[in-house]
Amino acid sequence: MFLAEPPRTRYDVNFRLAGIPVRVHPLFWLMTVILVATQDTKPVDVLMWVVAVFISILVHELGHAFLIRYYGWRPRVILYSLGGLAAYEPTWHRMLPQIIISFAGPAAGFLLAGIVVAAILASGHGVHIDWEALFPMPIRFDRYASRNLTVFVYDMLEINILWGVLNLLPIYPLDGGKISQEVLNHLNPAEGIKQSLMVSIFTAGGMAVVMFAKLGDLYAAIFFVLFAVMNYQMLQQYNDRFGGRGW
């Protein structure tokens, strides 16, 4: 999700998956725990959450990485702090491949959620959509005898569906923001970058209001405020460099 590749540490976990190098920065584990540590959760629930986040973000980034490799580049995956990164050094740039690469991450998560739903059905448990409770996760399923398994399955669905949808919002540097930037820059090379940053600011600001005022989710609201501020700063830097009306 975020763009800057963190420096290596001696506490990194390194491995390869399908020929793609993967590095897990220690801050990944810390921030994943912090996301639920403030809630009244049992230690086993925290463990289920960490495992679900690790699997889901890894699959998301591998979705990007497989398409990067398909287009002839050499990807590497880094999991760190608040997300992950499929890093590579592009040797050419075209709109459609970049859009496909950006969409491949959320698509991989949706596919994983579909596999989880299929596994629920295969185990003889019912699944339905609660249209009156779309947030944070509209899919409901019959509980398993094991509470831990039920928690893990719920976490997997929430992460891969909810985070996947939010990640497609036109907010840079989310995947949806990268897609909107590619489209707007293609339609208007002179102003596309600036327009995409403005879209990011308004979308992030609107989502912050919705998350806090309508859904009461302070942490999500803070994240969207940070996105709005970051894009505002990028817009100011863009105007300073290339000229344009400041805000």
Per-range role (PLM):
Residues 1-247:
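Hydrophobic transmembrane alpha-helices and their immediate loop junctions
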